[in-house]
Amino acid sequence: MNKTAIALLALLASSASLAATPWQKITQPVPGSAQSIGSFSNGCIVGADTLPIQSEHYQVMRTDQRRYFGHPDLVMFIQRLSSQVSNLGMGTVLIGDMGMPAGGRFNGGHASHQTGLDVDIFLQLPKTRWTSAQLLRPQALDLVSRDGKHVVSTLWKPEIFSLIKLAAQDKDVTRIFVNPAIKQQLCFDAGTDRDWLRKVRPWFQHRAHMHVRLRCPADSLECEDQPLPPPGDGCGAELQSWFEPPKPGTTKPEKKTPPPLPPSCQALLDEHVI
C-alpha cells in the first residue's frame, strides 16, 4: 500500500473517533491490577495509574483534557526518562497525551493511545519551566521544513537527538514515531551507535513531537503487541520511500466503522457506563 493510501486510512481511523465515545464518561481508573487489554488502536486498560502532575523533571500539558493516565510501566518510563534528561542538564520534558482513565477510543486526535502504553512528548526541552497558561495552550515547535524533506537546521538541537535516543534505548520501548525528516536527521547524526534507530519509525505528521509506544507488559495476557520493526537501522530504501511523490491513481479508501471491542473491554463498558 502506498504512503498516500496509508495516510488516508490513518486519517479515517482518527476521524471515526470524532463521534462521542463512552470512554469519556469514565472519569477515574477502573480498580484492579494493571492490565492493558487489546491492541493499541482498539483496547482499554484496567488499573491505570495517574501520572503525577507535579514533577521537577517534567511538565504535563493540557491537563484540562485529563489524558494523563496509563499503565504503571508508562508512568515509570516517563519518570525514568525525564530524570535522565534532567540529570544531563538538557531541560524539562514536556508530556502530551497519554490515555484516558480506562483507555479506549478518543473523540478525536488519536487512533491509538487506547491501552495505556502510548505517550506523546514534545521535541523541545525548555530550560525555563513553562507557565500554567503555556501548558494549557502549548505552542508546538515545528522542526520540519515546509517541503517536508529535512529538518530546519536552526531549530534542530543536539539535545533533541539525545532525547529521542534515550527514549529508544529504554528497555520497555518498542517503537517511537517521528516525522520522516526527523528520522532522516537521526540517521545522519547517529554515527556508529545505531542499534536504537531500529525502534524509531517514520510516520505522517509528528513534526513537533515523538509518539513513544511501550511493549505489552508480560502480565497483561490480553494485550496485543505489534510485530517487531524490521531488522536494521531503517535508514535505507524504506526511509527514502517516504520522500517519493505519491503514485498516480491513488484513491481514497472507503470509510470503515471501528472494529468490535475486545470482549473484556466491552464488559468493562457495560459495567461502568450507564
Curated annotation (Swiss-Prot):
Residues 1-19 form the signal peptide. Keywords: Disulfide bond, Hydrolase, Metal-binding, Metalloprotease, Periplasm, Protease, Signal, Zinc. Zn(2+) 1 binds at residues 110, 113, 120, 211. It is an enzyme of class 3 (hydrolase). Zn(2+) 2 binds at residues 147, 150. GO terms for cellular component: outer membrane-bounded periplasmic space. Its main location: periplasm. One of its GO terms (biological process) is peptidoglycan metabolic process. Its EC number is 3.4.24.-. It is found in: Periplasm. Belongs to the peptidase M74 family. Murein endopeptidase that cleaves the D-alanyl-meso-2,6-diamino-pimelyl amide bond that connects peptidoglycan strands. Likely plays a role in the removal of murein from the sacculus. This is Penicillin-insensitive murein endopeptidase. The gene is mepA.
